[in-house]
Each structure stands twice: as structure tokens, then as C-alpha cells.
Amino acid sequence: VEKNSELPDGHKDKKFKGRIVFEGCHVKDEANNWAIFSEIASCPATMHASKAADTYGLFPGHGIMQADARQAYTQCTLKGTETYVRLPYEAWPESWKERKMWDPVCPLRLSLYGHPDSGGYWEQHCESHVLTKGFEKIDEWRSCYYHPELKLFMIIYVDDFKLAGPNENLQMGWDLLQE
């Protein structure tokens, strides 16, 4: 996808963006049988939780801010069954091309969009980071957290974050999360 296509050619903000995904419909095991994955359940925040955050953000002196995690899934390593992938020729390192390799595979180390377990690993990684920053889980709602000192309520829906609370604390909350 071309971003900022309205800008003149050569402009620093005009660029093409894409995403490499794990195409789960072509996964086979070492015996060439279709692979079966054990589902690692992820549970993003609900619509009710989002509305509760909106309500909290509407209190006097409060606000709401949203942000996306950058390249969320690739922030965490893939665990479990060792997985190998074929890279498109355009992504091959020069050494593979020079050796005239045929159909090489390499281990998949980072979670990728499309892998059945990526969502669960991202959620585990994200929650562990959030908890180290002083946020506490809200037991009744998965992917919902409260920071008692800053009085911030945060929900996470996959890689989208919504933070609500006192206006003067919102930026401090984001700064904590980005450490």
C-alpha cells in the first residue's frame, strides 16, 4: 500500500508499506501431513470494557487516549513447536543467492500475523510488560488494567490500547508503557 500518495515523488513521508504474514493454510509437519496447532487462547478486551473506559474518560478532568503497538506480534518470540518458513526469493540474503540454494527454509523466531499461536504469545508478552509498569489486572475483565497510583484505566484489544483517566496522568501512563 502506498502511504501519503498525494505527496510529491521523493518526499520523505511517501512510502510503500506492507506486512509479511504466516499463511496458515499451507502448514505441514515433518511427514507432510497438515499441521495441527494447540490453540493458545487470547482474549482481547470486550466492547463493554471499551465503553467503561470511555465513561471513565468522560469524568470531569479526565480524558481518553488511544495508540497502536508498533509491529506488535514481532515484539515477542514464538515458542512451542519449532516452525520453519520459506522466504520469498526477494527476501533471501545475498549469501543464499550466491550459493544458488534451492527452496531453503529457516526457523521462525518471531511471532507473525497469521500464525495460530501469535495472538496468545503477544497477549502474554504484552500483559507481562504492562504488569511490570505498575498496572494491575482487573480480574473480571481480561485485557483490562488499572494503575492505582496514576488512576488510569487501560484496555487492550489485540494491538490497540485505550487509556482513560486524569488528563495530567495520561502522558505519564504512555511513557511508562514505552519504557
Where are these predicted regions, by residue range?
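Nucleic-acid-interacting cores, centered on viral/eukaryotic replication and modification enzymes
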Residues: 1-179
